[in-house]
Amino acid sequence: MFNHVTVLLKETVDGLDIKPDGTYVDCTLGGGGHSSYLLSQLTEGGRLIAFDQDEIAIQNAKEKFSSYGEQFITVKSNFRYLSEKLQELGITEVDGILFDLGVSSPQLDTPERGFSYHHDAPLDMRMDQDAPLTAYDVVNSWSYEQLVRIFFQYGEEKFSKQIARKIEAYRENKAIETTGELVELIKEGIPAPARRTGGHPAKRVFQAIRIAVNDELKVFEEALESAIEMVKPGGRVSVITFHSLEDRICKTTFKRNSTTPQLPPGLPIIPDEFKPKLKLITRKPILPSDIELEENNRARSAKLRIAEKR
């Protein structure tokens, strides 16, 4: 069953300033938590389009929200194709778009998907099960230099070189086939004192491989720009991030689109192309409350940012 505790539920949806007859997009359907609350805010004239790459998530939501009929539309697609998929549905602008960039709990908790360092499973980590690149390919085929780069850039792992060396040496004799084998190599690459602090030693490397397999940062950057273009004036974009790399992309994209660039002095009016597209609703990110953190440990790194189209 596709159960998932939704993070920052009301803050994210209420932050969209819902118009009951509006058109909204949930770019990350998952277990349907945000979609459920958003649908409850709509009248019969409103509708919600929900994206997910995961067929199980799509089928689950179709059953769960069948009573909404044509008000609820699912799209099995990566949200990097946001604009194209909406245009295929005849939709050129919307009232609000939300992103929840956390890996949904069912994906983490299903061992055979290979996302979790707590279970021994085949190295997979694909959000879209039809995608060609897997974690197995990354770990066994990518060069030492490529592994160091992703571990450092995407995982912010201090011991990237040591871990990549362990992987390189091991795979000369046999392929690394499971998450369990990978976890042991990561542990070997991290000095013992460092292994005892900062959570599970494999956390950062697993994050890095998952981001690489799914091209997550580039996809998000493209989709966020598309979302800003697709929302109507007065419409909003809500984004929940779970690590500093995603948050940096969101923060800089919102900031760039909400400020006027340096222009030559003495211009009588600001040309339209230089006028800010966005107004920041959250100057600082909204964080989960203490109560939410007690109920859902996975919310601890969540940050919510909201911007409005001018």
Curated annotation (Swiss-Prot):
Listed GO MF terms: rRNA (cytosine-N4-)-methyltransferase activity
GO biological process annotation, one example: rRNA base methylation
Described purpose of this protein according to its UniProt entry: Specifically methylates the N4 position of cytidine in position 1402 (C1402) of 16S rRNA.
Family according to the record: Belongs to the methyltransferase superfamily. RsmH family.
Species in which this protein is naturally found: Bacillus anthracis
Top-level taxon of the source organism: Bacteria
E.C. code: 2.1.1.199
Subcellular location: Cytoplasm
The keyword Methyltransferase is assigned to this record: yes
Tagged with keyword S-adenosyl-L-methionine: yes
GO CC terms: cytoplasm
Keyword set, alphabetical order: Cytoplasm, Methyltransferase, rRNA processing, S-adenosyl-L-methionine, Transferase
InterPro entries for this protein: RsmH (IPR002903), SAM-dep_MeTrfase_MraW_recog (IPR023397), SAM-dependent_MTases_sf (IPR029063)
Annotated protein name in UniProt: Ribosomal RNA small subunit methyltransferase H
